[in-house]
């Protein structure tokens, strides 16, 4: 006879209710399907995390807020004014965040997950197959190399990154990948003004312009975030992105 503890059932129910409230906050369509896929993704990440380091977060509630809710904050930006299919790239995706939660919640987008770590790329491929996601490609390559390839350069409507690199460094990775009219969505902490000021010249050099900063608190939490929207207005000069050592040692300023 199967015996399931009341404590386990109560914990599982609370977890699902938390995710329900997050999905409701973001007005996610087909929420029951989305919820199931997000829970399966979380379970897979936390299981694999026991064997090799994917995330420092091991608590499920914390995962829902800091990985899922944080990722879904991008959804409202991901639409083209002409109604055409959105093509997006997640730079430095790691184990697939924010890209995979975004793809689950907005399956119509065409998405490239980019990371240079082979183990993490292998995991992302496993995750997309496990979840049955289509219209998603994992590219295991340095972001600056991606920006030099004809297939990817100036081909995306949106780029996003949750990496800890400074904004001027991230912009050199992201802006060469964007079409003119495309946007880089940089996920940052609440206090980002100094970093933004330091990146203004770099953004202009790369063909971009700061469109807006949105500050907000993640649902069901006190976690404060910013999304910096940088619009690409001009073609990026061919010399960008530079090689990794140059980008790190002498960031654009």
From Swiss-Prot:
Molecular function terms, GO-annotated: rRNA (guanine-N7-)-methyltransferase activity
Coiled-coil region list: none
Keyword Transmembrane helix listed: no
Keyword Amino-acid biosynthesis applies: no
Keywords in alphabetical order: Cytoplasm, Methyltransferase, rRNA processing, S-adenosyl-L-methionine, Transferase
Gene3D superfamilies attached to this UniProt entry: Vaccinia Virus protein VP39
EC number(s) on file: 2.1.1.-
GO cellular component terms attached to this protein's record: cytosol
InterPro entries on file: rRNA_ssu_MeTfrase_G, SAM-dependent_MTases_sf
Positions with a binding annotation for S-adenosyl-L-methionine: 92, 143-144, 162
General function of this protein: Specifically methylates the N7 position of a guanine in 16S rRNA.
The family this protein is said to belong to: Belongs to the methyltransferase superfamily. RNA methyltransferase RsmG family.
NCBIfam families: rsmG_gidB
The protein's name in its UniProt record: Ribosomal RNA small subunit methyltransferase G
Organism, as annotated: Caldicellulosiruptor saccharolyticus (strain ATCC 43494 / DSM 8903 / Tp8T 6331)
